[in-house]
From Swiss-Prot:
GO terms for biological process: regulation of gene expression. One of its GO terms (cellular component) is cytoplasm. It is found in: Cytoplasm. This is Cold shock-like protein. Keywords: Activator, Cytoplasm, DNA-binding, Transcription, Transcription regulation. Residues 5-65 form the CSD domain. Pfam families: CSD. PANTHER family: COLD SHOCK DOMAIN CONTAINING PROTEINS. The gene is csp. Coiled coil: none annotated.
Length: 70
């Protein structure tokens, strides 16, 4: 199941950040390896994204993250 959300913050130096889900306003962890794009994988604060959610040992994690409208 796919969800939509907004990038809350993302550190290109550390390679991770958080996305706020539209439906629940919950924050979901995102790692750069889960971003679906060519080249350097990074996100910008405020970007709209679509993603899947899996349960990780530390909580929910975004997978197959796709930037919308680009």
């Amino acid at each position: 199941m796919s969800f939509r959300g907004t990038v809350k913050w993302f550190s290109k130096d550390k390679g991770y950040g958080f996305i706020t889900r539209e439906d629940t306003n919950a924050d979901v962890f995102v790692h750069f390896t889960d971003i679906q794009m060519e080249g350097f994988k990074t996100l910008q604060k405020g970007q709209k994204v679509e993603f899947d959610v899996v349960e990780d040992t530390k909580g929910p994690r975004a997978k197959n993250v796709r930037v919308l409208g680009e």
